[in-house]
A protein has these predicted regions:
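Short, conserved micro-motifs composed of acidic
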Residues: 1-177, 181-182, 187, 196, ...
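Beta-strand signatures of extracellular beta-sandwich domains
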Residues: 190-194, 226, 305-307
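Short, solvent-exposed loop/turn segments in extracellular or other extracytoplasmic domains
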Residues: 206-212
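A short, solvent-exposed beta-strand micro-motif common in secreted/extracellular proteins
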Residues: 219-231
């Protein structure tokens, strides 16, 4: 079918499930998978677990969310918001309105076991019946969920505007296309993003010829974005987000230089402070960019000529 790739198997290390049911939710960048499973080491019946994408493309051994979230009952139908911190799930292990109620909680650190107290989303969502599969849009404005409240048996889909207390943290969508710098035509490329303050992989996505790319930034600050594609030199750039106030979108297009002999690659000026031999702060970023460029290309393109223009 046009617009879809062929299905690929997903490997989760040491995966096991004693229940006939399981549910999964993957973050927008594919780096985090939240799931509902029943295991012999769990807190009760179905528990919530988290797994992280590994370098080999598999997901890590599932880690239990801990007793702040998981009870002796069933915790199921998890949904991780775009902020990567707010989790929505259904449970029959907490006091509530009926059979299976919908709750939300926020992650307090990177342990994935330290959470705020689960908040019941109230009678506008929860009923004496089965209320499950709560999900929200990236803006954090509209929620969708399933409920059997109409007839007590079959599930219907409902939507509701999120109340302030149920909203996730603000995020920013970074969107755009990657193109060939010579032809200006869009190309398929990979984008990896890291925070400058904590140089670990923050997100990964693909840019396609037809739809471009989209990345979610969950906090303000400086980010290093590396764009790569077969047959092209790596583009390494830094962007800075001063603040996040509500949901926002930024369009940022990138271009890659094709690997062709004789091409001239222009670098920005390396500047010094006035009447000083000390480099301007902005110059260090450009020097680092040149070093990363040379490291990424030197192995298969050993000959460079640098000269002022």
């Amino acid at each position: 079918m046009d617009g879809w790739t062929l299905p690929q198997p997903v490997k989760i290390n040491n995966f096991s499930n004693l229940n006939q049911y399981n549910e999964f939710c993957i973050s927008g960048d594919g780096g985090i998978m939240v799931m509902s499973l029943e295991t012999s080491a769990g807190k009760g019946l179905l528990d919530l677990y988290v797994s992280f994408l590994q370098a080999d493309g598999s997901y890590s051994t599932p880690k239990n969310f801990g007793s702040a979230i998981n009870t002796a009952g069933n915790e199921m139908t998890p949904f991780l918001a775009a902020d990567g911190k707010t989790i929505y799930f259904s449970s029959n292990g907490f006091p509530g309105y009926g059979n299976q109620d919908i709750f939300m909680a926020k992650r307090l650190d990177n342990s994935w076991t330290n959470w705020t107290e689960p908040l019941n989303l109230g009678s506008e969502v929860n009923t004496p019946e089965w209320d499950v599969y709560y999900s929200i849009d990236a803006k954090g404005e509209i929620a969708y969920f399933s409920s059997s409240k109409t007839n007590g048996t079959n599930l219907d889909i409902f939507s509701i505007k999120l109340p302030p207390q149920a909203k996730p943290e603000d995020v920013l969508w970074l969107k755009g296309v990657v193109s060939d710098r010579i032809t200006s035509l869009p190309i398929n490329a990979d984008l990896t993003i890291k925070t400058i303050s904590e140089p670990i992989n923050f997100g990964f996505t693909n840019s396609s010829i037809s739809s471009g790319y989209a990345l979610i930034l969950q906090q303000f600050g400086s980010y290093q974005i590396q764009i790569s594609a077969d047959g092209y030199y790596v583009n390494d750039t830094v962007i800075t987000i001063d603040s996040l106030i509500g949901f926002d979108e930024i369009i940022k297009n990138f271009s890659l230089i094709p690997r062709k002999e004789g091409l001239i690659i222009e670098m920005k000026n390396i500047l010094f402070k006035v009447n000083s031999s000390v480099l301007e702060d902005s110059s260090f970023q450009e020097i680092d960019k040149i070093v990363r460029f040379m490291k990424s290309t030197f192995s298969d393109t050993p000959h460079f000529l640098f000269q002022p223009i």
